[in-house]
């Protein structure tokens, strides 16, 4: 299991991402990707479903788009401006989140506390598919979670995992991304003791040692807010933020009313 601790210190980090097809059962949707009819995003007991009645429902999270029977063959898409849009099979817009920001790469993440949150744009990227100073070969390590939120920490061989890719805060103080063609590392092995990795509230990843001395930083500081580091299925580690929209309705999904934002 990844070792995640909530710290009171602020920090941030951001990454860019390619637009691959989303797989059913994953916990995030990237800009340009589509959740088709009967598609799911899942995280623990929470399940976001683009239902065949055209209603987007977050089960156990008490939220819905209230668009039942408003279309057929509906699809959910995240735009390059961070807006979630449901479109009918004929291409007409059925619902939108109405939360638009600057053009960039965004991620809609099903948070472990049961909220759907849109983060972006991306501010930092680790690329294991190109050669360079930080390259290193792949080796097998056990899998765990793929998300790190602002204020959370990885330490003592804690890791994020996605398919055959793993981002590990090693005990030797080196941050290593295993996978891709070349892998990646922070080149900080032996530079401190009891090191931990933290994502702050300005989109920056920071490695600190036991004395809180900064060992490494992504140097991706942005504006204050909530960010998320996603280890994607394609092997890229990307930081998105700040959060620009989230589900907030507490009423039952059985209730019917106006569109939520």
Swiss-Prot record:
Keywords in alphabetical order: Disulfide bond, Hemagglutinin, Lectin, Mannose-binding, Repeat, Signal
Residue positions binding beta-D-mannose: 51-55, 59, 63-64, 170-174, 178, 182-185
CDD domains named in the record: B_lectin
MF (Gene Ontology): D-mannose binding
Domain of life: Eukaryota
Stored SMART domains: B_lectin
Gene Ontology terms describing biological process: response to other organism
Cleaved signal peptide residues: 1-23
SS bonds (residue pairs): 54-74, 173-195
UniProt motif (Carbohydrate-binding motif 2) ranges: 170-178
Assembly information from the UniProt record: Forms heterotetramer of 2 chains 1 and 2 chains 2 arranged as a dimer of chain 1 and chain 2 heterodimers.
Function according to Swiss-Prot or TrEMBL: Mannose-specific lectin. Shows agglutinating activity towards erythrocytes from rabbit.
Protein name: Mannose-specific lectin 2
Species lineage: Eukaryota, Viridiplantae, Streptophyta, Embryophyta, Tracheophyta
């Amino acid at each position: 299991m990844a070792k995640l601790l909530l710290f009171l210190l602020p920090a941030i980090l951001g990454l860019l991402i390619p637009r691959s097809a989303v797989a059913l059962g994953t916990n995030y949707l990237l800009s340009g990707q589509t959740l088709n009819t009967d598609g799911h995003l899942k995280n623990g007991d929470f399940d976001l479903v683009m239902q065949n009645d055209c209603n987007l429902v977050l089960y156990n999270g008490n939220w819905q788009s209230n668009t039942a029977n408003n279309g057929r063959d509906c699809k959910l898409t995240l735009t390059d401006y961070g807006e979630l849009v449901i479109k009918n099979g004929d291409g007409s817009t059925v619902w939108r989140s109405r939360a638009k920001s600057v053009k960039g790469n965004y991620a809609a993440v099903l948070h472990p506390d049961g909220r759907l949150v849109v983060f972006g744009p991306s501010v930092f990227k680790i690329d294991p598919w190109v050669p360079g100073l930080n390259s290193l070969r792949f080796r097998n390590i056990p899998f765990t979670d793929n998300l790190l939120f602002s204020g959370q920490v990885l330490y003592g061989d804690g890791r994020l995992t996605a398919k055959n890719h793993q981002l590990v805060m090693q005990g030797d103080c080196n941050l290593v991304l295993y996978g891709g063609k070349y892998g990646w590392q922070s080149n900080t092995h032996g530079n401190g003791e009891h090191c931990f990795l933290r994502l702050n509230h300005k989109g920056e990843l920071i490695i600190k040692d036991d004395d809180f001395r900064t060992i490494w930083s992504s140097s991706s500081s942005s504006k204050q807010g909530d960010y998320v580091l996603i280890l994607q299925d394609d092997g890229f580690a990307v930081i998105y933020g700040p959060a620009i929209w989230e589900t907030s309705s507490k009423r039952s999904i059985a209730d019917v009313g106006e569109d939520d934002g």
